[in-house]
From Swiss-Prot:
It comes from the Bacteria. Signal peptide: none annotated. It is a multi-pass membrane protein. The keyword tRNA-binding does not apply. The keyword RNA-binding does not apply. InterPro entries: Chloride_channel_YfeO, Cl-channel_core, ClC, ClC-type_chloride_channel. One of its GO terms (molecular function) is chloride transmembrane transporter activity. The chain crosses the membrane at residues 10-30, 54-74, 99-119, 120-140, 149-169, 186-206, 223-243, 258-278, 300-320, 322-342, 343-363, 371-391. One of its GO terms (cellular component) is plasma membrane. Belongs to the chloride channel (TC 2.A.49) family. This is Putative ion-transport protein YfeO. Its main location: membrane. It comes from Escherichia coli O6:K15:H31 (strain 536 / UPEC).
Amino acid sequence: MLHPRARTMLLLSLPAVAIGIASSLILIMVMKIASVLQNLLWQRLPGTLGIAQDSPLWIIGVLTLTGIAVGLVIRFSQGHAGPDPACEPLIGAPVPPSALPGLIVALILGLAGGVSLGPEHPIITVNIALAVAIGARLLPRVNRMEWTILASAGTIGALFGTPVAAALIFSQTLNGSNEVPLWDRLFAPLMAAAAGALTTGLFFHPHFSLPIAHYGQMEMTDILSGAIVAAIAIAAGMVAVWCLPRLHAMMHQMKNPVFVLGIGGLILGILGVIGGPVSLFKGLDEMQQMVANQAFSTSGYFLLAVIKLAALVVAAASGFRGGRIFPAVFVGVALGLMLHEHVPAVPAAITVSCAILGIVLVVTRDGWLSLFMAAVVVPNTTLLPLLCIVMLPAWLLLAGKPMMMVNRQKQQPPHDNV
């Protein structure tokens, strides 16, 4: 016979697996539709019209029209496409299901149109809302927080193709006690994350690792080098943290989201012309292209890092629906490659992984997630002790510093009043 603790853990196992599978399928559906629309906008349509897809006019035009389209969705859809991600943490409170169609459409348009944001925040928001709404009907005795945790764990597992990220994130939020050990609390979320990851793996495998030269023996000087690289990435990220709420307040003085996002799309188009096509979109495929190309100089990598960081801030401040983690990883890769080009004596594995750690730490303020992203982009077990040590001064630098988020009290009134 199973112990009562084991029976308690098994109670949510089936719902957890179902939520993990559903979270992955929703992610896959959204990404597939966005991919088809992206191919239409950036491959077939310019080819039909006889225009180069990297033409400045085309880049500016598509991003401006994308901004206007997203603005129209936010202005006129029920629920205004959910909350502004610039004002929300990665895992937030459930939103009304009526806001989800507009949120999904706004996300797909942004992903396909080349906006420098990832899918993570809106997808987690959608899955939490559905899990809470459906779960409350089927199992009303289970509280909303449990459904929120299961949906976010399943989505994180699906996004990264592994339950490890969910385990790391929730190990610091689901505190154990003398009565309920931590792993009892983690059991159902890990089931959801594993189901989400395995379902994603049936359709495609998220590819984060970069072909960077293997790092061998760790030296004491490498720790100092890694700490300096992380500090540089943190400094760059804190510039974005300072800019985001100010730009957000300035742009939203116009109140009408069609104008705000249209102007935001225009600015993103201009940044895209300067940075080139590799600086567009969420950044995961583009960072693979950047590393494989090997045609950039120190100044070229620096320009890409600055453009992508600026595009991230503009997209978030404008109110585009998307997450900030994936483009931040691109910024970290560009910064790391730039620093390696500038000081070749420091291995690229150190500069890239420590830059990712620093910039993701600024964006998420989550040490485990930052370590995870650095480790999966530069997969080398020799780096793990170094990254753990470098995390310590990086965390000290950010202690008490503002988050990359707009103060909720500064949010504009609903667009119903416009």
